[in-house]
């Protein structure tokens, strides 16, 4: 669980850096999903460009915060057998993913290049959560 939390932080850093690069758009989003790039967006509307940039930074911040919460709750609470820490460590990324993921599918932003790393980190997290849950349950018997 902690490893997946750290992976979420890594993805957030990557997301943050891309905002200031020539790529600008999110990882795995290209001309097949968005027909214009950074320069065209900025030329069309500097204020729209600034708004999109601020959203990228906000998402990066929330991804990092989610990863940090999951990692710290897992490392300092779940490892000690606290069920409340397990519940919180699971709830934090589940809430974030439940809000964020569905919006990707109707607009064609569900590419493996865009969501693949999140899917991988989520799979690692789920495996860790199941293993940790079994361990906590055995401790409480």
Locate the predicted segments by residue:
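Hydrophobic alpha-helical transmembrane segments of polytopic
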Residues: 1-7, 59-62, 66, 85-96, ...
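N-terminal signal-anchor transmembrane alpha helix
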Residues: 1-30
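Structural signal for membrane-spanning alpha-helices in multi-pass inner-membrane proteins
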Residues: 12-15, 74, 100-107, 128-132
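A loop-to-helix transmembrane entry motif
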Residues: 24-31, 46-66
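Luminal/periplasmic active-site loops of membrane-embedded glycosylation enzymes
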Residues: 31-44
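Juxtamembrane helix-break-helix junctions at the cytosolic face
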Residues: 67-86
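Membrane-helix boundary connector in multi-pass membrane proteins
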Residues: 98-118
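Membrane-water interface at the C-terminal end of transmembrane alpha helices
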Residues: 123-141
